[in-house]
């Protein structure tokens, strides 16, 4: 994601605490018709949330597990002709009932699946992390541009009211000059056999999966792109975390001189916060990155922002971008690329025993 954090962060528009999330939606002639690809736990969350959507509707599924098909057809009214597997995915190209495919497959499959969907001419949303590395992310962006399709990454918090208010305050100067950022996100992971603990499917561990929340948050909290990275890993369970990172702390240096202290883990709970301090005030979100409810406070008191269904807001918001031409809130593939450049640097620093890794020109 190394183009300019300022672009993504600046696009986070302000939101009044008394306003509904999207009070002025232009209603198009049709809804955005969406197929979900990869019917795991998160796909179920997205599907349920989409029942609240004004501008998007679930019309199709792509799955490699035939036993899931009947339940999904029953729960969401999916027609037989809109059910696909990974072998006949290319046939979506000829299906007018599907405008966009939302990819929620394991991390290391994102690159392959985005290229396949782009080749069908359908728009793409891909869950984060967008890819295994920045090189793959760049290839995905290029493929979507060549195909003439929109490519978004599932940064749902870019539509979340507390997050948007924090960015509004920073942009308006209400926090003053940003002095420090402290972000962390993690949880104690369960089932030791799950794909998130297998590098071939996950691409990495806590840093790849949930560390990107702390990283992305540091970027929009400062409105800057980091110029250097240092990182350290703690591994207390070398059996469970044999293939992937367990707990990572990392520091991001920004052009203004601000240093963000960040952390992520797969080995303990109660680790979720975004805290930005300026010379005029502060803003804190805690919980900051989960599915909600997000809670926030500032030097002025509680934020008192509306509580929303994140995935419904994301899908309606991106449908508005596609159907009505509304500018996107920093969720394109380029935003995913910016994060992956930093993730690559974190892993490089870990390999080099915490060495400072410079981004761009040294």
Name every feature range the model reports, one short phrase each.
Residues 215-291, 312-327, 358-361:
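Contiguous beta-strand/loop segments that form the cofactor/metal-binding neighborhood of enzyme cores
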Residues 1-21:
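N-terminal export signals
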Residues 14-53:
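C-terminal segment of N-terminal export signals and the immediately downstream linker at the start
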Residues 139-156, 176-181:
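Rossmann-fold dehydrogenase core element
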Residues 7, 301-362:
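C-terminal helical cap and adjacent loop that interface with cofactors, partners, or active-site loops
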Residues 81-143:
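Beta-loop-alpha module in the N-terminal Rossmann-like domain of NAD(P)-dependent dehydrogenases
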């Amino acid at each position: 994601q190394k183009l300019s954090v300022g672009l993504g962060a600046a696009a986070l528009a302000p939101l009044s605490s008394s306003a509904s999330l999207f009070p002025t939606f232009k209603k198009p002639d049709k809804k955005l018709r969406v197929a979900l690809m990869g019917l795991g736990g998160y796909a179920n969350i997205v599907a349920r949330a989409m029942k609240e959507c004004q501008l998007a509707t679930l019309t199709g599924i792509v799955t490699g597990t035939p036993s899931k098909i009947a339940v999904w057809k029953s729960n969401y009214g999916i027609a037989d002709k809109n059910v696909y597997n990974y072998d006949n995915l290319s046939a979506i190209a000829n299906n007018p009932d599907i405008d966009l495919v939302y990819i929620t497959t394991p991390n290391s499959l994102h690159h392959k699946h985005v290229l396949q969907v782009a080749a069908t001419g359908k728009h793409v949303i891909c869950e984060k992390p967008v890819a295994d590395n920045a090189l793959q992310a760049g290839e995905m962006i290029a493929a979507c541009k060549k195909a003439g399709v929109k490519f978004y990454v599932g940064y749902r918090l870019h539509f979340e009211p507390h997050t948007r208010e924090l960015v509004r305050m920073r942009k308006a100067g209400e926090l003053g000059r940003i002095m420090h950022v402290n972000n962390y996100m993690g949880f104690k992971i369960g089932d030791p056999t799950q794909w998130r603990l297998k590098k071939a499917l996950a691409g990495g561990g806590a840093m790849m999966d949930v560390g990107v929340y702390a990283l992305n948050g540091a970027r929009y909290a400062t409105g800057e792109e980091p110029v250097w990275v240092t990182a350290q890993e703690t591994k207390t369970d070398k059996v469970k975390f044999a293939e992937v990172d367990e707990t990572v702390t990392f520091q991001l240096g920004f052009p203004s001189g601000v240093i963000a202290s960040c952390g992520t883990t797969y080995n303990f709970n109660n680790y979720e916060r975004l805290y930005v301090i300026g010379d005029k005030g502060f803003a804190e979100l805690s919980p900051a990155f989960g599915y909600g409810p997000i809670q926030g406070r500032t030097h002025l008191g509680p934020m008192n922002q509306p509580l929303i269904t994140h995935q419904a807001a994301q899908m309606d918001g991106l449908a508005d971008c596609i159907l009505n031409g509304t500018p996107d809130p920093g969720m394109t593939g380029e935003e995913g690329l910016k994060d992956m450049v930093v993730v690559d640097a974190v892993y490089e620093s870990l390999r080099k025993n915490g060495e400072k890794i410079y981004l761009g020109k040294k």
